[in-house]
Amino acid sequence: STSFSVVDLIHPDDEVTQAKTDGVAYRIVERGTSDHTIDQAFKRMAIEAGATLHYKSRIDEKDADIVACGPKDTSALALGEIFRTSHPNHIAFQLNDKLAPGAYSYLIIIDGVGLICTCLWRKQKKSERFLNECIATYQRLYPDIDMEPIKRVGGKGDFTLNGFYPVPEPGQHFVGESGGLQDFMWGFG
């Protein structure tokens, strides 16, 4: 993980203020398929403990010891662009309905790789335009950030506080979003 003690908070009028602390305010943990990510560390630990992972196949939930499926419904959409940069580590967060209707956008730069992302609470017509406008806004607010695009990414999410969660079979565990566990601030499983 990478520790941060400051975050830029970008107001809807593009004023930038900073929230800071003398200690560690938060840590960013990288997800994904690269060997050094938390996902792969958990995968290695599970396999070493004897777990069998099922990819691109469907088994009945009642036959699984651990149920760790992502969201079944979609109430949120995330669109982003990953890029290379020489800019130092940096985090910025913005609430602006013009860039992310009903939600938020953010900029993360860690160790030479950046991500600008917009989150939308529902699919919008021409959703990609919100990402393009986000990128243009962050480039205007941070003109010293050089960006060499790598790829565009996207995902879906769902957030509910009153969803139906089945009673586990004996010895069965529901984890993450399958277990109803969500970050109450941002809704991540």
Where are these regions (language model features)?
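Flexible, glycine- and charge-enriched loops at secondary-structure boundaries
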Residues: 32, 124, 186
